[in-house]
C-alpha cells in the first residue's frame, strides 16, 4: 500500500463571483490529478481572502500566500486572474512571473512557494461556456446554441459574460410570462461550478494549461513522477 498524504491547497481569486464558480473546479481538478500520484492524497481546499486595497498583483499574491502558509500550512496556492484577451501570455508574463519570483525570494516557511496560475481566456465566464448544455439546463431553456447566440468556441468570445447575459435574456423571452422569473448570471456561478464536467473543460486550452500547472505542482512535492 502506498503512502497517505493530506494536502492543504489554497485558492485566491480576483473576485467573489469567481470563488463561487472556481472553488469546486479547483478541488475536482486536484482530486483527479491526485489519482495519478504515488499513494493516496486527500485534498482540502481553502479559499483565501485578503484586504487588497492599495496592493498591486504581486503584493496581493504575497499577502495571500503568507496567509495560506500561516493559517493552513499550505505549500501550494492557486491564484486566478483573467487574461482579458485571447492569449494568457501577457497576464502570465506581467503578473505571474513577477509574483512567483517574489514568493521564491521570501524566507522559508513564511509563505506558500508553489504558485499555480489559473488564467481563463478573456474571463472566467469562458469556462462556464465549456458546458453549454449544463448552462441551458440551469437557465431553463431548450433553445439551440445558435438561437442563443452561443454557437462559437468559448475562448473566441471576447465578452463571455455578456454572451451569457444575452442568452438568459433570449431564453426569458421564450418563456410564458407567468412562468418567468428574473434569473441573473450571479445565480449561476455556484451551481455551474458544482455541476460542470471536468472533461468538458478539457476542451479549453486555458483549462488544459491549468491542468498542466496542477500536475507540475504535485511533481514539485515529489508526489508524482517528474517526466
List the predicted regions and their residue ranges.
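C-terminal accessory helical subdomains adjacent to catalytic cores in phosphodiester-
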Residues: 2-8, 19-48, 59-227
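Short hydrophobic beta-strand that contains or immediately precedes a catalytic carboxylate
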Residues: 11-13
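Short polar catalytic/cofactor-binding loops
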Residues: 15-17
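Non-catalytic terminal and connector segments of soluble metabolic enzymes
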Residues: 54-57
Amino acid at each position: 500500500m502506498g503512502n497517505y498524504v493530506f494536502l492543504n491547497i489554497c485558492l485566491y481569486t480576483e473576485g467573489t463571483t469567481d470563488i463561487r464558480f472556481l472553488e469546486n473546479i479547483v478541488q475536482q481538478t486536484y482530486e483527479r490529478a491526485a489519482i495519478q500520484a504515488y499513494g493516496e492524497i486527500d485534498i482540502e481546499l481553502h479559499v483565501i481572502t485578503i484586504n487588497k486595497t492599495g496592493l498591486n498583483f504581486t503584493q496581493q499574491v504575497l499577502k495571500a500566500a503568507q496567509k495560506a502558509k500561516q493559517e493552513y500550512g499550505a505549500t501550494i496556492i492557486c491564484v486566478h486572474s483573467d487574461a482579458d484577451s485571447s492569449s494568457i501570455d501577457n497576464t502570465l508574463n506581467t503578473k505571474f512571473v513577477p509574483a512567483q519570483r517574489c514568493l521564491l525570494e521570501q524566507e522559508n516557511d513564511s509563505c506558500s512557494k508553489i504558485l499555480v496560475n489559473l488564467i481563463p481566456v478573456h474571463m472566467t465566464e469562458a469556462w462556464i461556456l465549456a458546458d453549454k448544455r449544463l448552462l441551458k439546463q440551469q437557465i431553463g431553456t431548450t433553445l439551440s446554441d445558435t438561437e442563443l447566440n452561443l454557437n462559437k468556441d468559448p475562448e473566441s468570445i471576447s465578452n463571455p459574460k455578456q454572451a451569457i447575459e444575452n442568452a438568459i435574456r433570449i431564453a426569458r423571452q421564450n418563456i410564458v410570462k407567468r412562468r418567468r422569473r428574473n434569473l441573473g448570471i450571479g445565480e449561476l456561478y455556484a451551481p455551474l461550478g458544482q455541476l460542470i464536467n471536468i472533461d468538458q473543460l478539457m476542451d479549453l486550452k486555458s483549462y488544459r494549461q491549468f491542468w498542466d500547472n496542477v500536475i507540475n505542482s504535485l511533481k514539485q512535492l515529489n508526489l508524482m513522477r517528474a517526466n
